[in-house]
Amino acid sequence: MAARAERSVKRLATTWVATARCLLPQPNTDPLDPGEAQLWGRHHIAHLMVIFTDTLQTVTTPTTIRPMTLARVIDERRKATNTLAAIGHEVIADDTASRLASQAQRLLDNVESVLLATPGPPATVDSLVGPVRVTDQLRATLLAMAAMGLHDGIDIPSGAIIESCRTLSAVLDETHGGRTIELRVPPACAVQLAAIGSGPNHHRGTPPNVAETAPVTFLQLATGFSHWPEMRSAGRVQASGSHVDDVAGVFPVVDMAGVFRDIFADD
């Protein structure tokens, strides 16, 4: 069991590192050309550095305190947005984007060496927001990086999109689980949800209300980068059942679009 858990952490960590590298300019790109400087602005790079530093400190700080649930981890990190943004502003100081990018690359190398070491990080660690499972720290920060990719139009690994969808569906199951609507996101996940207000409570088999969408669309909906009515109108959601549009009420699961609009406003 321990070996299987360690392999699972390694797979997640590998996806985490690959995603982080996609969000940084290529090493030794100095100075950044105008297009790169616009894409990889100082606040973008500084926020990544905050994520890297937070993760490095967290995965090297074991704890025996009972970890919080994934949904609470996501919510507590949302509440800490202003704190993280303030740290990012301190990181920027008077540095250029090029110098920040070089620092971020070195920091990411350090994170990678810790995450992929054998043995790996402890199972439960002390984070910025309290005791968490190391996998939940990686999932929460991977979700933040996937949302950064959406915000900036940067392609990220498909594994990161799939993992982020699974994180979001787990949060939905914890916060809005029920037996009225089945939301399918093949091949990533499926989750059964309660209706908003009154609705049938199905006890066996597939609920009578079914919605299905692609992972990228689900990620956009769940992080606030798109909205249910427009995705329905565009044919990017297939739905059936009289209560299926109640799904709109659970989005966004976490409003990363609003967070990044504020953090990156000066880039």
Regions found by a protein language model. Give the residues of each.
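Short, helix-capping/interhelical loops that line the mouth of catalytic, cofactor-
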Residues: 53-109
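Glycine/small-residue-rich hydrophobic helix-like segments
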Residues: 177-219
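Alpha-helical scaffold segments that form or flank carboxylate-/histidine-based iron centers
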Residues: 2-9, 29-51, 89-100, 124-141, ...
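Short, mixed-charge aromatic SLiMs
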Residues: 68-72, 166-175, 244-250
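Short, hydrophobic/amphipathic alpha-helical patches that form generic packing surfaces
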Residues: 47-50, 54, 141-151, 171, ...
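C-terminal interaction segments
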Residues: 2-12, 16-27, 54-56, 61, ...
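Charge-rich, acidic-biased intrinsically disordered regions
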Residues: 64-76, 130, 134, 188-189, ...
